[in-house]
C-alpha cells in the first residue's frame, strides 16, 4: 500500500455500496482502502438491539461512530457513553471499548483510520441478499469471502488487528 499516491474524489450512495450480512448486522461498505489509498474506511451499519461488539482494542486504528438513527451505549475503558442520533463518538487506538444497541435498531457510520478493518469484516461475513438486517436464522459463513487469509489481511492492513477481550462490562 503506497500512501504517497493521491486518492481520487468519489461519491457512493448507501444504496450502491457493497453489502454484507454477519454478526446480525447489515454492513454497507462506503469507502475502503482501495477508495482512499489506505487513509480511512467508512462503513454504514444497521444493527439490531442488544450487545453489538464485545470488549476489544484496535491496536493500530482510530475508530469513530456517528449515530444516524437510534440509541446506543458505548463502554470506553468501561465508562458508559450514551449516544443518540447526531452523536459522534471517537475511540483512540489502543483503547478498550464495547457497545450495545439500546433502541430497536441503530443506523450508524463507522470510520477507521487508517483503513483495513473492513477487510476483516468482508472476510467473516457473506454478501447480503437485501439491504435489510440478516435473517435471525442465518448460519455463520462456512468460508472466508475474501481471497486473503486473516493473517494476510493483518499483514497487508495492520489496522485490521483487533484484540477481543473476555467479559462484557456493559
Where are the model-predicted features located?
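A hydrophobic, small-residue-rich beta->alpha segment in the mid-to-C-terminal subdomain
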Residues: 107, 119-139
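Short, conserved beta-strand element in jelly-roll/cupin
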Residues: 42-49, 57-76, 111-112
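Conserved hydrophobic/aromatic beta-strand scaffold that supports enzyme active sites
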Residues: 29, 42-46, 64, 80, ...
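Short histidine-centered beta-strand/loop micro-motifs
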Residues: 31-32, 52-59, 100-101
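Ligand-binding loop in jelly-roll beta-barrel domains
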Residues: 36, 73, 93-122
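Short acidic-glycine-tyrosine-enriched beta hairpin
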Residues: 11-13, 78-96
